[in-house]
Design a protein with these regions (language model features):
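Tandem repeat scaffolds
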Residues: 1-169
Length: 169
């Protein structure tokens, strides 16, 4: 896995090439437009992606632990089996995204938009969803133990077979 810097990432994106399998950890990629890119199996740990455009991006199997995606847009993206533990996702937009099997352990997703997102089979333990919009989201078969859903919009949310031990609604 080759470690890339911001300039190299921007050149790859401009050429239309894939970033799949790249090491993008610990670099500042804030405000970068990744829309439509293949970023599957990337290492994005501790990466600054604040305000980045990640709409319709394939992030399947990527490690994004402790990344900062505050105010990022990830609409209609694929985040299957992505590790986002300890990540900062405040005010990010995940509308219509496929997030099956996502790991959000202790992530801060407060104020985010997860409208019609699929978070089934996710590890959502101790995740802060305060003030988030989960309108129509699918959380079936997820582990929500000790999560905070204070002031979150949960209208139409599927909590079927979820572990809701200690959840703060």
């Amino acid at each position: 896995m080759q470690k890339l810097n911001r300039a190299e990432v921007e050149m790859i994106l401009a050429s239309g090439s894939s970033l799949a399998g790249s090491d993008l950890s610990e670099i500042n990629l804030s405000e970068v437009d990744f829309s439509g890119s293949d970023m599957s199996s990337c290492d994005l740990r501790y990466t600054n992606l604040t305000g980045a455009l990640l709409d319709s991006v394939n992030l399947t199997d990527s490690n994004m632990g402790a990344a900062d995606l505050s105010s990022a847009s990830l609409r209609k993206s694929t985040l299957k089996n992505v590790d986002l533990r300890w990540a900062i996702l405040k005010d990010a937009d995940f509308s219509d995204s496929d997030m099956q099997g996502i790991g959000l352990l202790e992530a801060n997703i407060s104020g985010a938009i997860l409208r019609n997102a699929n978070l089934s089979n996710g590890d959502l333990r101790r995740t802060d969803f305060s003030g988030a919009s989960l309108l129509g989201a699918n959380l079936s078969d997820s582990n929500l133990a000790m999560a905070a859903l204070t002031n979150a919009n949960t209208e139409g949310v599927s909590f079927d077979t979820c572990n809701t031990y200690g959840v703060k609604f």
